[in-house]
Amino acid sequence: MKGVAITGMGIISSIGNSVEENYISLIENKIGISRITNISTVHADVIKVGEIKKTNEELVKELNLTEDNNFSRTAMIGTLAAKQAVENAGITSINEFRTGLISATSVGGMDMTERHYYDYFTHPELVKYITCHDGGTADTANDAGL
């Protein structure tokens, strides 16, 4: 291998839903820390976070996922950013190139754990939600065709 080429960028954060929006927000010193509004959690009124201002339902729709998918919120956000990076690179067919994925994200799936933990032991169909606690890299790579 002779080197690595970074050909595209994508980002979804609490201050923007694209590279351009994030850049503008940084220049304008926008603050992305606020109360939790889009995740159902016992911590909603207790802590402030850098929350992505999209609901899980909006993310599912934007990614054209089925209702019964097991993408964690983290995986959906990472997948959206990866789609932006591929588009930013001008790539129309991912398999034309030797492609790798470097993903920098948080742990995923905690939202699924909070939602399904107590029912997990008596409802085997919920296993798919509890086992998705990686950062979503595999889901993102599969969605991109890697």
Question: Where are the regions that the model predicts?
Answer:
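Conserved "HGTGT" condensation-loop signature of ketosynthase/thiolase-family condensing enzymes
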Residues: 1-146
